[in-house]
Amino acid sequence: MARVSSLLSFCLTLLILFHGYAAQQGQQGQQFPNECQLDQLNALEPSHVLKSEAGRIEVWDHHAPQLRCSGVSFARYIIESKGLYLPSFFNTAKLSFVAKGRGLMGKVIPGCAETFQDSSEFQPRFEGQGQSQRFRDMHQKVEHIRSGDTIATTPGVAQWFYNDGQEPLVIVSVFDLASHQNQLDRNPRPFYLAGNNPQGQVWLQGREQQPQKNIFNGFGPEVIAQALKIDLQTAQQLQNQDDNRGNIVRVQGPFGVIRPPLRGQRPQEEEEEEGRHGRHGNGLEETICSARCTDNLDDPSRADVYKPQLGYISTLNSYDLPILRFIRLSALRGSIRQNAMVLPQWNANANAILYVTDGEAQIQIVNDNGNRVFDGQVSQGQLIAVPQGFSVVKRATSNRFQWVEFKTNANAQINTLAGRTSVLRGLPLEVITNGFQISPEEARRVKFNTLETTLTHSSGPASYGRPRVAAA
């Protein structure tokens, strides 16, 4: 009897553990059955706008079928001149792209020291007991950012942006909700360290909207005063209870943070030294505190594919930026001229989120059933998801078409349907002949006519693109 009881207890324990594991996998993986059975895709626009004093945050509905299938959410930050996006952190990994403008970015990585120190003493605006108090400011790393920069941010790392230029600073970000690092539900949750959001938490669909306040607001003023060793009045000011400026505020006067000079302003010796050592470390000296998290994709000289008459494509993966291995995301930047075509391809191991930064293009996407689920025009500011395995072709219809793709794998791989490195090139002629019921001569043309690997001209003989007419 005791043996039966022990066996039942053991089985019950296994059952509980299995259900817990299954629940965790369901939370971090696909939540709904057949949510990637997509029969139609659409070019998406923002569904909500959070307005602030010096800018706005535009949020896409992450419950849209194609974004839910991809396990991501998407947002666009528009920061006006002298606008400061107050520090916040998310429950998910984030990959951002600077679509327009320039500015400053700072991160606060837990456990890391303040490596930026002011060489001159700082005198605050207040004086204590008749004596002026002087000290040197110290803080963590501050970087210059510009158009084309791709920025990797790990979960829980507080981040802020400042626009020190004259035009708006536009940053688009993808949040990996399905990441193993997200221990909450599949909703993006910003945690604000400063400021308030009177419009509420629009990131969470279906939840009653209440004004979103910063973290300090939830603690008692006495607790804040004791923890920071400040007076009660200052502690209450940290809570921003009567501050309705939003999450992007306007800086009055100069913004005097410690920052390195711009690249063109650095001494020539420093730039030559960096050039001799290269831009990539050997991996031994890079720690979490000093890890490089930014790389620029707008330099054609560093492109992976470049044709002066057609355009260029640049990729960014964990081999270029090692921190991407940790957040398991990567990026691609494309810029093509009118009538240039990106040959049909599919992502072998990742979903892709395509955001148009400039121009227009005609895009076709085909699903696993061989059905065309999207055939339309996409233009600046629109977004479309391309799920794993779905084939896609892009053709520029404006003078220049530029886009950025965020991919849900640190080393995303593509396969092409046409071209010198395509799947058709790898097939024997006999397989093509019998598979498509065409002659050996036609099979040779199918296999060898396209010499390019990625980019080609979409214009050609009048017969291109027309159905083949059967002989009478």
UniProtKB/Swiss-Prot annotation:
<dbReference type="GO" id="GO:0010431">
    <property type="term" value="P:seed maturation"/>
</dbReference>
<dbReference type="InterPro" id="IPR011051">
    <property type="entry name" value="RmlC_Cupin_sf"/>
</dbReference>
<dbReference type="InterPro" id="IPR022379">
    <property type="entry name" value="11S_seedstore_CS"/>
</dbReference>
<keyword id="KW-0732">Signal</keyword>
<comment type="similarity">
    <text>Belongs to the 11S seed storage protein (globulins) family.</text>
</comment>
<feature type="modified residue" description="Phosphotyrosine">
    <location>
        <position position="312"/>
    </location>
</feature>
<dbReference type="GO" id="GO:0000326">
    <property type="term" value="C:protein storage vacuole"/>
</dbReference>
<keyword id="KW-0708">Seed storage protein</keyword>
<feature type="modified residue" description="Phosphoserine">
    <location>
        <position position="314"/>
    </location>
</feature>
<keyword id="KW-0926">Vacuole</keyword>
<dbReference type="InterPro" id="IPR014710">
    <property type="entry name" value="RmlC-like_jellyroll"/>
</dbReference>
<dbReference type="GO" id="GO:0045735">
    <property type="term" value="F:nutrient reservoir activity"/>
</dbReference>
<dbReference type="GO" id="GO:0009737">
    <property type="term" value="P:response to abscisic acid"/>
</dbReference>
<comment type="subunit">
    <text>Hexamer; each subunit is composed of an acidic and a basic chain derived from a single precursor and linked by a disulfide bond.</text>
</comment>
<keyword id="KW-1015">Disulfide bond</keyword>
<dbReference type="InterPro" id="IPR006044">
    <property type="entry name" value="11S_seedstore_pln"/>
</dbReference>
<dbReference type="GO" id="GO:0071215">
    <property type="term" value="P:cellular response to abscisic acid stimulus"/>
</dbReference>
<feature type="modified residue" description="Phosphothreonine">
    <location>
        <position position="115"/>
    </location>
</feature>
<feature type="modified residue" description="Phosphothreonine">
    <location>
        <position position="408"/>
    </location>
</feature>
<feature type="disulfide bond">
    <location>
        <begin position="36"/>
        <end position="69"/>
    </location>
</feature>
<feature type="domain" description="Cupin type-1 2">
    <location>
        <begin position="295"/>
        <end position="444"/>
    </location>
</feature>
<dbReference type="InterPro" id="IPR006045">
    <property type="entry name" value="Cupin_1"/>
</dbReference>
<feature type="domain" description="Cupin type-1 1">
    <location>
        <begin position="41"/>
        <end position="236"/>
    </location>
</feature>
<keyword id="KW-0758">Storage protein</keyword>
<feature type="signal peptide">
    <location>
        <begin position="1"/>
        <end position="24"/>
    </location>
</feature>
<comment type="function">
    <text>Seed storage protein.</text>
</comment>
<feature type="modified residue" description="Phosphothreonine">
    <location>
        <position position="433"/>
    </location>
</feature>
<dbReference type="InterPro" id="IPR050253">
    <property type="entry name" value="Seed_Storage-Functional"/>
</dbReference>
<protein>
    <recommendedName>
        <fullName>12S seed storage protein CRA1</fullName>
    </recommendedName>
</protein>
<dbReference type="Pfam" id="PF00190">
    <property type="entry name" value="Cupin_1"/>
</dbReference>
<keyword id="KW-0597">Phosphoprotein</keyword>
<feature type="region of interest" description="Disordered">
    <location>
        <begin position="259"/>
        <end position="283"/>
    </location>
</feature>
<feature type="disulfide bond" description="Interchain (between alpha and beta chains)">
    <location>
        <begin position="112"/>
        <end position="289"/>
    </location>
</feature>
